[in-house]
């Protein structure tokens, strides 16, 4: 679970963040702030800017597989609001 940086399923306890990601997803784990030097950091790096953990509107970019689950962009345009369901 170290290479999940916002793209992993380390949010198993916060599946509801998908809706109110900006307030419910407050669970932003420190794992999300992993060094962007990671392979998936290319798209997830945007999270640091948003402070969310989804990589801004580059959600399609950080299609890191979301922890093996299908990442579904809740904010079809926002990019920050995926569901690890």
From Swiss-Prot:
GO CC annotations on file: intermediate filament
Tissue-wise expression: Wool.
TM helices/strands, residue ranges: none
Keywords of the record: Keratin, Repeat
Region (12 X 2 AA repeats of G-[YCGS]): 37-82
Keyword hit for Heme: no
Domain of life: Eukaryota
InterPro entries the UniProt entry points to: KRTAP7
General function of this protein: In the wool cortex, wool keratin intermediate filaments are embedded in an interfilamentous matrix, consisting of hair keratin-associated proteins (KRTAP), which are essential for the formation of a rigid and resistant wool shaft through their extensive disulfide bond cross-linking with abundant cysteine residues of wool keratins. The matrix proteins include the high-sulfur and high-glycine-tyrosine keratins.
Assigned protein family: Belongs to the KRTAP type 7 family.
Subunit structure: Interacts with wool keratins.
Protein name from the UniProt record: Keratin-associated protein 7-1
Organism: Ovis aries (Sheep)
Organism lineage string: Eukaryota, Metazoa, Chordata, Craniata, Vertebrata
